[in-house]
């Protein structure tokens, strides 16, 4: 089974990818991780990627797809894999399709975690953690029992990620949608696009995804 998971930053894509990996035996493939591994291993395509990176240039789609092609030949991918963060453009999607076709493989499902942008901004900007034990909290629905005091360790110091502000999050969402929007009709036309409610609670989203994937066992 070959699956692509689409979702904006903060939609919980990473959490769901881990759950899919565990429950369906799919290997989660991150293009960033694969690039670094290929460069470190000194593979032919890794050397090409290194040349681009050292020159301060973006690695080409051809090289990224080549790295994916090498990676999925490994034994742990024989039962299937989940692509996280790729493709981001129609050109990348087409290159991926061509590569899979050459290997007599096909994409089974593209799962879009659909979100409400304004609600997602609230979800992301409201989160914070204990500076001491890293326990997670939220302004809207997960405040400490005693205001300003961590439930877990009693610390009164909390941290927020610097990029968890409304302007930055909104810009990231806008970038995601501008890149990803053309992918949706592309995959819908191929009959592989499945949409789940990314604003539901974690377990409900997992159940929706499992329902989609159950048709491919």
Spans of features found by a protein language model:
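Glycine-rich phosphate-binding loop of ATP-dependent small-molecule kinases
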Residues: 1-217
């Amino acid at each position: 089974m070959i699956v692509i998971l689409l979702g904006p930053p903060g939609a919980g894509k990473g959490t769901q990818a881990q759950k899919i990996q565990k429950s369906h035996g799919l290997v989660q493939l991150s293009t960033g991780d694969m690039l670094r591994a290929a460069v470190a291993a000194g593979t032919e395509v890794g050397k090409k990627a290194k040349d681009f990176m050292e020159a301060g240039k973006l690695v080409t789609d051809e090289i990224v797809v080549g790295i994916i092609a090498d990676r999925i030949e490994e034994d742990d991918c024989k039962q299937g894999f989940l692509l996280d963060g790729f493709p981001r453009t129609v050109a990348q999607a087409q290159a991926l399709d061509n590569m899979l076709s050459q290997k007599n493989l096909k994409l089974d499902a593209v799962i879009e975690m659909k979100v409400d942008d304004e609600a997602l901004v609230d979800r992301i900007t409201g989160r914070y953690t204990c500076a001491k034990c890293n326990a997670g909290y939220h302004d809207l629905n997960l405040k400490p029992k005693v205001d300003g005091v961590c439930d877990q360790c009693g610390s009164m110091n909390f941290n927020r990620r610097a990029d968890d502000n409304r302007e930055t999050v909104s810009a990231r969402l806008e970038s995601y949608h501008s890149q990803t929007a053309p992918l949706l009709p592309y995959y819908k036309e191929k009959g592989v696009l499945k949409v789940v409610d990314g604003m539901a609670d974690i377990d409900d989203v997992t159940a929706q995804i499992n329902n989609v994937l159950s048709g491919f066992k």
